[in-house]
Amino acid sequence: KANANTALLKILAQEGAGADVVSAGELYLALKAGFSPDRITFAGVGKREDEIEYALKNDIFSINAESSQELQVISLVALRLGKKARISLRVNPDIDAQSHPYITTGLKQNKFGIPAEEALKLFQYAGSLSHLEVIGVHAHIGSQITKVEPFVEAAAFLAGLVKSLREAGLPINHIDFGGGFGVQYINALACEGLPKEPEGGAVPPLQLFVEGALPVLKETGCSLWFEPGRSIVANAGILLTRVLYTKENGAKKFVVVDAGMNDL
């Protein structure tokens, strides 16, 4: 999601990175760039049946499911293909990432994941479907998170969830911790009238984010996957956009540009 540049993807694949995809198109790019299928996860709330089939045919590591209906579809596709689908369930921990509300994904009001209070029931349901192999738990609480505390809270939540699931007889051995690690953007071009971003200090280094979450996660003995995404490529380029219009709606002034949230 953070980078679709095939030249950069090839370098990341050669360096041993994995890939998190949210569409068949992204999965195609990842495979074309040389990512090993056993290092690819498929996330997203709206996976089509044909996309699920494409993922299963390529034997990727895990499909991260987000609802009971999706579990049914994955199971039916796997049955049709004569396969057993490896899945993780994304759980919504209701944790405030303390980032921009448009890119917060771990609160109850967000569409992502299954509610924490329903997790055990849905994990048991997934385990009852003969063509699913439940291997892990997944969470992702937001993007551009600049504080360590939400990650510490998320790690404690996931470790507790794994413990509860194991006590219920579910052999969970994998945690996908998600990402959202904030980055300090570097302003390559200064513009009069716009504030210059400080050179450092506002965002902790990536190491501190990981160190905050790692101790409690390691105690589970699970394989651990992180999604550093934006933090890898954020300062590898600049976004050049043009002001199209300015407008006022009541007390607010808006500047309309030819770029969107997806470009950020």
Describe these PLM feature segments:
Residues 2-174, 183, 244, 256:
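Active-site-proximal beta-alpha core segment in soluble small-molecule metabolic enzymes
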Residues 143-264:
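C-terminal active-site-proximal or functional interface alpha/beta core segments in diverse enzymes
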